Amino acid sequence: MHYLLFYDVVPDYVIRRQPFRTAHLEYARPFIQRGELVLGGALADPVDGAVLLFRGQTPDVARTFAAADPYVARGLVTGWRVRPWTTVVGPGAEVSLP
């Protein structure tokens, strides 16, 4: 199953994240290596959030990520939520089209 982790972020997020960016990316590395974190990045125009795509049996993988993400711990993320995403089109889709 796929899960989307949505982050709401502080104003000037792109500038304010710089001191913590390396820690955030290093924190993400094991999730990527295990195949749990598929894609992620900031939204653009305006940069008012970020979205990360996870693969797992439950939404706990995305919740676990958010709970200890340096961006969350340092107050750059003002709120987050996880939503299940039923994927049906494209490589890696969870539900195949007939």
Report each predicted region and the residues it spans:
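Conserved, structured core segments of small domains
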Residues: 1-98
